[in-house]
Amino acid sequence: EVTLTPQHGDGDEAVYAGCVLLSGKGGVLVHDIGINGTTYRHYAREDYIEQLALLEPELLIISLGTNDSYSYSFSMNSFRESLDRTIHLVQEALPRTKILLTTPPPSYFRQAHGGQHGRHRQSKASTVSYTFNDNARRVAAEIMRYAEANGLAAFDLYSAMGGEIGVEQWIQDGLIANDRVHYSVRGYERQGQLIAEALQAALGA
């Protein structure tokens, strides 16, 4: 049991952002930070990066881009600005931390049709269709371009999964959730395995 008691005077504000419990054992220490629906723009904040810097990570793996790309009104210019600002804030706060960018995996736009219900309307079953999200491919290409231009390590998860063609096999294997944006537990485990294998190859392990 852990009890936190803020110590502050009148008019002061205490903000709880999280805590880290260490076992004291050796080995690799991994922090997994993420919030559903976030984009590069959400992390491009000085206050957040300052908190991140307290962890003093040796390696920071940034896996974003799916939510950035999941919009019919997607703007590449806005994405570039958010990506660049996030990286610059990280580099300023964590100059000794190595950065690894990963690209978003393939995804689909989901559209529901029909299913009207009302007092004077005849209800009918709705149908769902899926359209491949080409913005994910564009974001993946931009992340790889940005990484090369700025001397950063990057792993192209989009291509490693086979892109628009290869993702069909992932669907057949049950590795993608029904919304075709998120992945199943096995799907995320497979993504993690691909990234881990790429890291091991880069480190010569």
Label each residue range with its predicted role.
Residues 94-98:
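A short helix->loop->beta-strand "cap" motif at the edges of active sites that frequently abuts
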Residues 80-87, 140, 192:
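Short, hydrophobic/amphipathic alpha-helical packing segments
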Residues 1-85, 92, 182:
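Conserved SGNH/GDSL esterase-like catalytic core that processes O-acyl groups on lipids
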Residues 68, 105-108:
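Short, catalytically relevant binding-site loops at active-site mouths
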Residues 34, 103, 158:
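Residues at the C-termini of beta-strands that transition into short coil/loop
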Residues 62, 101-102:
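Structural beta-sheet core signal
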Residues 31, 100, 153-155:
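Hydrophobic/aromatic beta-strand patches that form the interior of the parallel beta-sheet core
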Residues 45, 107-205:
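Catalytic His-Asp segment of secreted/periplasmic serine-dependent ester chemistry enzymes
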